[in-house]
Amino acid sequence: LVRFDASASLSLGGFSRDVGWALTLGDLMRSLRGLFAERPYNFSWVDEMVAASGRPVNRAQMLYIASLGIKAVISLTEDPIPEELVRGLGLECYHVPMRNHEMPDDESLERAVGLIASLTSSGKKVLVHCAGGQGRTGTVLAAYLILKDGMSADEAIEKVRSLRPGSIEPVQERGLREWAKRLEGRRRSG
């Protein structure tokens, strides 16, 4: 993992960070590539109501998302999508920040999954994204499949990875298994 330490404020694709922010090479590459792409990085459908991607970084990408009938965007990144990218597009934006390369806490994970379930049950198509659309996004999607379809953690992880190769980091994989056990325990006692 290559990191660059910013010595000044940096702005790429509508997102800015202050001095001292560590910029990974992956972040830089996604941002630069995203500036010229009309489709968000790593975009794909998970089912007929839920899509996933890396962070949308320009207005054209938000127009693309809206053109697909997506009505809600759930951002898992530390920063929400800037208002100027979505203004007037009829998109509902939700922000459930999660730290990159870590397993989210139960409250954040269940909030994101609850949003997906609530929005899709009301007929709204949803986009879930993090920076690259793999770690945090894959983790939330697997948790959604565990709750929605009653899959085991391993089945959900396998399903997400079959649809979105490279998804879910090892620490998140272990965390999903532990979370699924806690969820099952709450269901039994509850």
Per-region residue spans from a language model:
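Cys-dependent protein tyrosine phosphatase-like superfamily
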Residues: 1-127, 142-190
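Conserved G/P- and acidic residue-centered "switch" motifs that form tight phosphate/ATP-binding loops
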Residues: 133
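Ser/Thr-glycine-rich phosphate-binding loops at phosphate-binding pockets of nucleotides
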Residues: 137
